[in-house]
Every structure is written in C-alpha cells, then in structure tokens.
Amino acid sequence: MKLSIRTDIKPETILRARGLGSDNAAQKMLAQTVVRLCDPYVPMSSGSGAHMKTAYTIAPDGSSITYRGPYAHFQYVGEVMVGTRSGSPWAKSGEKKVGAGRALSYNGAPMRGRDWDKRMMADRGDEVVKVVASYVGGKAK
C-alpha cells in the first residue's frame, strides 16, 4: 500500500500570524514590555520631577532600547563622573568626563538605580517570558 501526502504550508503566513514575520511585531512588543516593566527601576531626576524613563527610543524594528540624554550612561553605570580638567561633576562645556570611583546615590533607591534592565529581568523575567509567549501563541515553561 502506497501512501502519498501533500501539504500546502506557508511558513511566512504562520510566522506573521504569530508576530514573527518580517514586520518584527513580537520583537517590538517585547521591547515595549521591557520598557514598561523597567519603568519603576529607571532613576528619577530630582528637582525637575522629570523622569529619565521618558527619554528613551525603541529602534524601529524593536531590536534595541536606547535611553537618551547626557546623563543616561553614568546613571546606568552608577558611578559619579567628573571632568578631566576641573575634577568637578559640573564639568565645563566640552570637557571629557571620567569615573571618579564613587557610587551614585539614587532617589527612590533601592528600586531605582544602576543596571535597571538587569535588575528588572532578575525580578520580573518570568513575566516577560509569559507575555511574549502568550503574544506569539505559545506557553512559557
């Protein structure tokens, strides 16, 4: 007995329906979820009340999240930066800054502070996995 089976599967259609097509819908949703869950961990500016969390950009394809601003890097690293010539945290315009070997103190610590993405993933990584798995039609293990 001979058995012949023919299938007409369109992988691109299946992937696109699950947000995994060339439009990167699942990746964009992942980036938006990470930004939302990182929010309580991102340092908050004192004085002006402005949050650094509002100064981010998600890449058009969802592949990266960039926190903008002249202070974003040292906030993320968590080290006081000083001017190379002045030795002051209030460096002159155009003066290069270097780490001073002292940790920053954060308003809202210990929740808000350095390495906010890593700390969020340590605390809520399972939630991120569940959200993405649900979005693409799967189940988190």
Annotate each language-model stretch with its function.
Residues 1-72, 81-141:
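Short, Lys/Arg-rich flexible segments
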